[in-house]
Amino acid sequence: MLPTIGWEDGEVVMVDQRKLPSREVYVRCRTAREVAKAIRTMVIRGAPAIGVAAAMGIALELRRSTASGTTQLAKEFYRACDLLAETRPTAVNLFWAIQRMKRVFADAMRAGRSTDELKSAMESEARGVHDEDVANCRALGRHGAAVVPTEANVLTHCNAGALATGAPLRLDHPTSRSVPEPDALRAQRPTRG
């Protein structure tokens, strides 16, 4: 299975879902602005994947910050949050992830953490958002595999499946019972261009 999104060499790397299935292309993001563009232009799709991207974009922006104090770092943090919040107003997980990052940032600020500690806390939280999403997807796959017959015709609506992450239909995840290709028709109806 293609990885949807991850960290590589200090960058956020995501599969360009607009190019699938004909080509496997990866987009590398070095700033929150680049992550925001990837979300806005639908390089990455599916609300949970968008939430993961937002958390990683925030952490990425702080990682590259040269702020000498926590006040300046906080300004950069909230600017990155606002930038990412403007990308997809219907993606619930986007706002959930941003609020989660804000809560952790505020707690770390109240605890008197240094700029380096704040940066580390944000990256750790973004990794946590990602890891929890992967675990949730695996659980959805296990539960779905138990109720969907092996020989089933499945029509999904919007972005369901491995690349959307967290979607209600994840039966073809490698950690769950696979739905054999000849036995199941997987079709998707996009909800927007």
Describe the residue ranges of each PLM region.
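Positively charged, low-complexity intrinsically disordered leader regions
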Residues: 1-33, 37-40
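N-terminal active-site beta-alpha-beta segment that forms phosphate/nucleotide-binding
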Residues: 43-193
